[in-house]
């Protein structure tokens, strides 16, 4: 490989669009399963991690190469909301609850409230995911409740199952990426307006 070709590869890598996603949810909702499914296309049902884990993953979203940095958060209890550091680090939040756990649904509502208190002016891109949709016999949260919450949050929503739906899991991350990129374009346009410079 020539040195020009190597420089071209380096240039391409450095021009990758980076998107930082924090996966937020109560313990046991399948945050790690969703994240690993997205990263590797494999499903692993049991995880035992005691701290936040970060991953990097390059993928095409709508034909554009994106470097995802994903923070798989690890709250110790239903009362432990995302830290300010996590909220400030992230470009977007993937809020995950289990359709089989009413408490986890309430957790994502509280997490969103914490975000609003932390920065009332922020318009953090969000996506809401109801995981474990294959376990309808244990359902505690209706699809309609998820849709209403997503409408309140003004965000994309889907019910999925990390155990079975590779494409839908990827689409959750891709949709959040689209929201992050759209927010960046809006912010850039606002800064470019003549009145914004004064």
What would you call each of these model-derived segments?
Residues 1-187:
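TRAFAC-class small GTPase G-domain
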Residues 189-198:
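Post-kinase regulatory C-tail/linker adjacent to protein kinase catalytic domains
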């Amino acid at each position: 490989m020539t040195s020009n070709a190597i420089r071209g590869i380096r240039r391409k890598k450095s021009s990758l669009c980076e998107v930082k996603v924090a996966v937020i949810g109560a313990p046991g909702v399948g945050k790690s399963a969703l994240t690993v499914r997205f990263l590797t296309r494999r499903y692993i049902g049991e995880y035992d991690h005691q701290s936040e884990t970060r991953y990097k993953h390059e993928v095409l979203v709508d034909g554009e190469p994106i470097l995802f940095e994903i923070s798989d958060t690890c709250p110790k209890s239903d009362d432990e909301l995302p830290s300010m550091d996590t909220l400030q680090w992230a470009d977007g939040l993937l809020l995950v609850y289990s359709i089989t756990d009413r408490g986890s649904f309430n957790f994502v509502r509280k997490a969103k409230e914490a975000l609003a208190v932390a920065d009332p002016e922020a318009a953090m891109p969000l996506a809401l995911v109801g995981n474990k949709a294959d376990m309808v016999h244990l359902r505690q949260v209706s699809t309609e409740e998820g849709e209403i919450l997503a409408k309140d949050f003004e965000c994309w929503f889907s019910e999925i199952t990390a155990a079975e739906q590779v494409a839908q899991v990827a689409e959750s991350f891709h949709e959040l990426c689209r929201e992050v990129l759209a927010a960046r374009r809006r912010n850039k346009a606002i800064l470019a307006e003549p009145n914004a410079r004064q």
